[in-house]
């Protein structure tokens, strides 16, 4: 498979481990993951991550709901390192489009990762302001699309076509976000995505790829038996 794995999280020690193992090619974070990890200082976390991982792309997200402040935060994050991609949500919480902000940042040479995308129409609008000369990431939340009982595959393929229409396929990378299971990696690769974000729990399951299913079945039976024994259950 050609697809690149990016680790999604905000635990510095886990990020360093992934970086040293060489399995993942980049990293993404967001305010929710940072809060869950107990991060108190956004700036300290960002600087520490860049210092520990200086030569792999890392995405940090702006957190204001006002576009002028988003712009200021984006420039500050961009200045922290050459490997930084600035995450911009496709809209603010009022549903107002972030496309004008993205256009302004791209014109200033900022590498953006536009996030929380769910539709090909959003990608179409975004593609019109991205640059074929500046790297960018288009994060489509395939896992959340699937949560809504919709098949994400045709949507992801349509998003890929939108980027190709604007001749952006070599600079604007399509990212399959909110991965739910290991098989999503194959799905994303088949759809033409260049990147998929994976959690540490998904990364640990990669060793199961190609595992003999009869052997896996027996291991599962043994797990149930051992847990029942350990619990001391009786009937």
Give residue spans per PLM region.
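Catalytic alpha/beta core domains of metabolic enzymes, predominantly
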Residues: 96, 103, 110-204, 210-231
């Amino acid at each position: 498979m050609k697809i690149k794995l990016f680790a999604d999280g905000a635990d510095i020690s886990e990020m360093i481990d992934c970086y040293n193992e060489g399995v993942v090619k980049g990293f993404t974070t967001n305010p929710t993951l940072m809060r869950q990890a107990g991060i108190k200082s956004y700036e300290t976390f960002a600087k520490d991550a860049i210092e520990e991982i200086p030569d792999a792309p890392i995405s940090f997200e702006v957190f204001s709901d006002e576009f002028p402040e988003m712009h200021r935060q984006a420039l500050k994050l961009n200045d922290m390192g050459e490997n930084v991609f600035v995450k911009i949500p496709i809209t603010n919480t009022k549903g107002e489009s972030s496309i004008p902000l993205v256009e302004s940042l791209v014109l200033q040479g900022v590498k953006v990762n536009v996030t929380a995308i769910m539709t090909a129409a959003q990608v179409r609008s975004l593609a019109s302001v991205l640059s074929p000369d500046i790297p960018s990431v288009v994060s489509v939340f395939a896992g959340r699309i699937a949560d809504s009982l919709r098949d994400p595959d045709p949507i992801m393929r349509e998003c890929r076509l939108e980027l190709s229409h604007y001749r952006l396929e070599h600079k604007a990378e399509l990212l399959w976000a909110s991965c739910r299971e290991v098989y999503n990696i194959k799905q994303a690769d088949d759809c033409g995505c260049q990147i998929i974000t994976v959690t540490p729990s998904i990364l640990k399951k990669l060793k199961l790829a190609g595992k003999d299913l009869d052997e896996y079945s027996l291991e599962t039976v043994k797990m149930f038996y051992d847990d029942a024994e350990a619990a001391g259950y009786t009937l």
